C-alpha cells in the first residue's frame, strides 16, 4: 500500500512505526458555526482512510481535536452575548450530528483544546528552556530560526517568508517569522493562569500537545486540508520536533480544496453551503458519495449537476442491493437453500474476484476512492446482468456480500432510508416539543437525530417547527 507523502512529495510504501498498529491525527474543526461542505471533505476522506486501514487489519488509534477557544469563537460569543464555552459546546454538538449523518465513525479520542491547557503550558516552558522560545511582555514566541529544518513540509524558504513578513512585524518580536505560543488576555476573553501572564494558547501549540499526549512523540499519519500545510502543520513540526528531537509524523496527508461551480466558495459569491443546507435537499449519503467521487488530493467541484449525478450513482448501487435482498428472500420463501454453485456461477465469481482485486489495488494506491467506486459499479453491472431468481443462494449471497463490504469500506450506505409517514413525523415532532418543555434536551436531540436518520430535516423557527424531506 502506498501513500502520497506531502513531506517528500512522492508516493511511499506504507510501513507503520509499530507493526499492525497505526497512529493517526487529523486536525479537527474550530467550533463556531455549522460546518460547510468544504469542511466535510477532510472528515469524510480521512474517515475512509481509517476504514480501509482497519479493513487491512490495522489497529487504528485515530485522534481528532476540537479547537474550542479561538478569535472566531470569541467574536461569535460577543455578538450573541454568551460565553465562548456556550458557543463551542453548541457547535460541537451540531458537528457531531452532521458527521454522524455522514456516516463518519467515532474517533478513538476527541480532545478539546481548553481541557489540555496545562499540557500546552508545559510544552511552552520546555521550548523556552531548550532555547526555542522566548517571552516578551507576557507573549511567548517560538524562535523559528532555531529549527533548522523550518519549511521542510511546505518547501518554503524562511528568508523569502521573512521578506513578506517584515511589513506587519510586531516591534517586540526578535524575528518577523517568530509566531505566538501564548498570548495575554484581553477584556471579555477567556483566560488561563500561566507563568508569563493570564492568557490563552496560540493555535499551533494546541495540536502539538494533543497529538503528543494521545499518540506519543512520533505518529504514523498526520492529516488535514491542504490549507493547513502552511503555517499550521509547518509550525506543528517545528514545535514538536524541537521538544522531542524526533521526527514528528512519518506520513503527511492533505486533501484538496472544494470549489462551487468552479469558483472558490464564499458568502460574498452567494455559493456558500453548509452541510445542513445540502441535507435539506439530498440524503447525507449522497454528499458522502460526492466527496469520495474524486481523488482526495485533487480539487473537487460542487454543482447541482454533479450532486444529482452522485445521487443517481448511489441509487444505482442501492437498487442493486435491494434487488439482491429480494432475490435472497424469494429463495428462502421457496425453501431453495442449496449452497452449490453452477459452473457458470463459479466462472462469474472469478470476475467478481478480479473486481475485488481492482478495488483493493485502487485503495492501495493512495486511497483512490474514485477508481474504487468504479469497481463497485462494475460489480453492480455484473449483478444486474447475471444474478437472477434462477441463481443459487450461494451466488446471491456472495455477490451481495461483495458489494456491501466494499461500500461499507467507503462508508456508503447500501440501504435506502425507509419512508416515514407524515403522521409519524408530526407525532415525533410533538414528542420532541414536549421533551424540550420538560428540559429533557437529551430526549429532544435523540428524536431530532432519529428524524435526520430517516431523511427528515427539522428547522426551529419563531412560527414553530418546520420540516422537510431530504
Swiss-Prot record:
Required co-factors: Zn(2+)
GO CC term (a single one): cytosol
EC number: 6.1.1.16
Subcellular location(s) of the protein: Cytoplasm
Alphabetized UniProt keyword annotations: Aminoacyl-tRNA synthetase, ATP-binding, Cytoplasm, Ligase, Metal-binding, Nucleotide-binding, Protein biosynthesis, Zinc
One BP term from GO: cysteinyl-tRNA aminoacylation
'KMSKS' region (motif): residue ranges: 264-268
UniProt catalytic activity: tRNA(Cys) + L-cysteine + ATP = L-cysteinyl-tRNA(Cys) + AMP + diphosphate
Segments carrying motif 'HIGH' region: 29-39
Protein name (Swiss-Prot/TrEMBL): Cysteine--tRNA ligase
Organism of origin: Lachnoclostridium phytofermentans (strain ATCC 700394 / DSM 18823 / ISDg)
Gene transcribed to yield this protein: cysS
Amino acid at each position: 500500500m502506498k501513500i502520497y507523502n506531502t513531506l517528500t512529495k512522492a508516493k511511499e510504501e506504507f510501513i507503520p512505526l509499530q507493526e499492525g498498529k497505526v497512529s493517526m491525527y487529523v486536525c479537527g474543526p474550530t467550533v463556531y458555526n455549522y460546518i460547510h461542505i468544504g469542511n466535510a471533505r477532510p472528515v469524510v476522506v480521512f474517515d475512509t482512510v481509517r476504514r480501509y486501514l482497519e479493513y487491512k487489519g490495522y489497529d487504528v488509534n485515530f485522534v481528532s481535536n476540537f479547537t474550542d477557544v479561538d478569535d472566531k469563537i470569541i467574536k461569535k460569543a460577543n455578538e450573541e452575548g454568551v460565553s465562548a464555552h456556550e458557543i463551542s459546546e453548541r457547535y460541537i454538538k451540531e458537528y457531531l450530528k452532521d458527521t454522524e449523518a455522514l456516516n463518519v465513525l467515532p474517533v478513538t479520542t476527541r480532545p478539546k483544546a481548553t481541557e489540555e491547557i496545562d499540557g500546552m503550558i508545559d510544552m511552552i516552558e520546555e521550548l523556552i528552556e531548550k532555547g526555542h522560545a522566548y517571552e516578551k511582555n507576557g507573549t511567548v514566541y517560538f524562535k523559528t530560526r532555531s529549527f533548522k529544518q523550518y519549511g521542510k513540509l511546505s518547501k518554503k524558504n524562511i528568508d523569502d517568508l521573512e521578506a513578506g513578513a517584515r511589513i506587519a512585524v510586531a516591534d517586540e518580536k526578535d524575528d518577523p517569522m517568530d509566531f505566538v505560543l501564548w498570548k495575554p488576555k484581553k477584556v471579555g476573553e477567556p483566560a488561563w493562569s500561566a507563568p508569563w501572564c493570564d492568557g490563552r494558547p496560540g493555535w499551533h501549540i494546541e495540536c502539538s500537545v494533543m497529538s503528543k499526549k494521545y499518540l506519543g512523540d512520533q505518529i504514523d499519519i498526520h492529516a488535514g486540508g491542504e490549507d493547513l500545510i502552511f503555517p499550521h502543520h509547518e509550525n506543528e513540526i517545528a514545535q514538536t520536533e524541537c521538544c522531542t528531537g524526533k521526527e514528528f509524523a512519518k506520513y503527511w496527508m492533505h486533501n484538496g480544496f472544494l470549489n462551487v461551480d468552479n469558483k472558490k466558495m464564499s458568502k460574498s459569491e452567494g455559493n456558500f453551503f453548509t452541510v445542513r443546507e445540502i441535507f435539506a435537499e439530498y440524503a447525507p449519503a449522497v454528499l458522502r458519495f460526492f466527496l469520495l467521487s474524486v481523488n482526495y488530493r485533487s480539487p473537487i467541484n460542487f454543482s447541482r449537476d454533479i450532486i444529482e449525478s452522485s445521487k443517481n450513482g448511489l441509487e444505482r448501487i442501492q437498487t442493486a442491493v435491494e434487488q439482491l435482498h429480494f432475490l435472497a428472500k424469494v429463495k428462502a420463501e421457496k425453501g431453495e437453500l442449496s449452497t452449490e454453485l453452477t459452473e457458470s456461477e463459479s466462472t462469474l465469481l472469478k470476475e467478481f474476484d478480479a473486481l475485488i482485486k481492482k478495488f483493493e489495488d485502487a485503495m492501495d494506491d493512495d486511497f483512490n476512492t474514485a477508481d474504487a467506486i468504479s469497481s463497485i459499479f462494475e460489480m453492480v453491472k455484473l449483478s444486474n446482468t447475471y444474478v437472477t431468481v434462477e441463481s443459487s443462494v450461494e451466488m446471491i449471497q456472495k455477490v451481495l456480500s461483495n458489494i456491501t463490504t466494499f461500500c461499507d469500506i467507503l462508508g456508503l450506505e447500501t440501504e435506502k432510508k425507509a419512508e416515514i409517514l407524515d403522521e409519524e413525523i408530526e407525532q415525533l415532532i410533538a414528542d420532541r416539543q414536549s421533551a424540550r418543555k420538560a428540559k429533557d434536551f437529551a430526549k429532544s436531540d435523540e428524536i431530532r437525530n432519529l428524524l435526520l436518520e430517516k431523511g427528515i430535516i427539522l428547522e426551529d423557527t419563531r412560527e414553530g417547527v418546520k420540516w422537510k424531506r431530504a
